[in-house]
Design a protein with these regions (language model features):
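Conserved donor-binding/catalytic core segment of Leloir-type glycosyltransferases
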Residues: 4, 185-203, 209-212, 226-227
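Nucleotide-sugar-dependent
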Residues: 15, 94, 203, 263-268, ...
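Donor nucleotide-sugar binding/catalytic pocket of nucleotide-sugar-dependent glycosyltransferases
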Residues: 139-181
Length: 373
């Protein structure tokens, strides 16, 4: 079977979202399917590309900005010419008459089409005026767009989204790309926590740092450190985090590494004992979510904590659930939980073998093409 994986943005192999897309592409291929990636490149002019081949060049200026959001005929033409059977679209919250027409044309010639919505619900992620204007258009057309699809792929527990049936999967793991952590070699009276993300307010890292401020309000025998890895999404998050650090003199205990990947990221993980997931999903109205980060922590072989509902991990012995509210994270609770851990990194990693990307993407194929099972 021939699959076209369609995204409406750029593709950078070092970017976290692009890495996930690479894993999904490889998973389709591992299941025996010929798979092609269509993405936008804006390095010189605005160009739509499939596997390195330019299928549309929109130029620059206002015309290019408009065409990249409205011209999808080149995608359909490519799909027809190359006899694509299945189109897997990653949503960019861009439901409009042009995306609807694209899907209708694909369906008319017999292609199966699904759309992945990475995070749902997502309306509360739109907080400034420009973003809210973009959301208005999506709200107007998304139910009609969903009606054209064969299904919506979700990492939530919703059976339907925008009136369309869902295929519920988990964020997966590409085990070949995630090295298990090595043993930490820091002093026994230290606990090193790590949080890896493009840092948004819904990650709730401020709650962890507020918790450290309370923890260090008195003299402590156990020294707890928080390694924050990743860029801040906006100055708002960065200013909030740095303010809490400075006001509480936590510069020695909260280490802002910036964005790291590859061996540099592996080296930081090797220093760390405990993973920090999301502690602020309630801020954007999300209760159920299966984040990629939780799975990466497990693949690394470290225990971790989060505050949402993740049915793949909620009952695991190496997972600590925290309240989904605005209270500072209780650092002593983390210390006591960590002291009781008996699972080895290998045991933690082996517990999620069923969450490979190959298995997750096979579930999509089996749902869309049941006769091929």
């Amino acid at each position: 079977m021939k699959i076209l994986f369609l995204i409406f943005h750029g593709f950078d192999p070092n970017n976290g979202i692009s890495k996930k897309i690479s894993y999904q592409l490889n998973a389709f291929k591992a299941n025996g399917h010929e798979t092609h990636l269509c993405y936008m490149d804006e390095s010189s002019s605005k160009r739509r590309i499939v596997d390195g081949m330019v299928i549309a060049d929109y130029g620059n200026g206002k015309k290019g900005k408009i065409l990249k959001r409205t011209e999808f005929g080149s995608i359909v033409d490519y799909a027809i010419k190359n006899k694509i059977d299945f189109v897997y679209i990653r949503s960019n919250h861009n439901a409009n008459p042009f995306t609807i027409r694209m899907i209708r044309r694909m369906k008319k010639v017999g292609m199966k089409v699904v759309m992945e919505i990475p995070t749902y619900p997502y309306d509360q992620e739109y907080f400034d005026k420009w973003m809210k204007r973009q959301l208005i258009q999506d709200k107007i057309f998304r139910n009609l767009l969903a009606k054209q699809l064969d299904a919506i792929v979700t990492f939530s527990e919703y059976n339907t989204i925008f009136g369309q049936r869902t295929i519920r999967i988990s964020n997966g793991i590409d085990f070949d790309s995630v090295r298990m952590k090595k043993n930490s070699n820091h002093p026994a009276n230290e606990l090193h926590m790590i949080g890896v993300a493009e840092i948004h307010h819904w990650h709730g890292f401020d709650r962890v740092i507020e918790g450290l401020a309370r923890y260090y309000a008195i003299q402590r025998e156990i020294k707890v450190y928080f390694h924050v890895v990743g860029y801040f999404f906006s100055p708002i998050e960065e200013e909030e985090i740095t303010r809490i650090i400075q006001e509480n003199n936590l510069e020695s205990y909260v280490i802002l590494h910036g964005k790291k990947h590859g061996n540099e990221l592996d080296d930081i993980f090797d220093q760390c004992d405990f993973g920090i997931g999301s502690f602020g999903r309630h801020r954007v109205g999300i209760e159920h979510i299966k984040t990629l980060k939780n799975r990466e922590y497990a693949a690394k072989g470290i225990p971790f904590a989060y505050s949402e509902t993740d049915t793949d991990f909620d009952n695991k012995p190496y997972v600590l659930k925290m309240p989904a509210d605005e209270t500072p994270i209780n650092i002593e609770t983390i210390i006591e939980f960590y002291k009781k851990q008996t699972e080895t990194p290998m045991e933690i990693r082996n517990s999620i073998q069923d969450l490979s990307w190959k298995n997750q993407m096979k579930r999509v194929i089996d749902s869309v093409f049941p006769s091929k099972n």
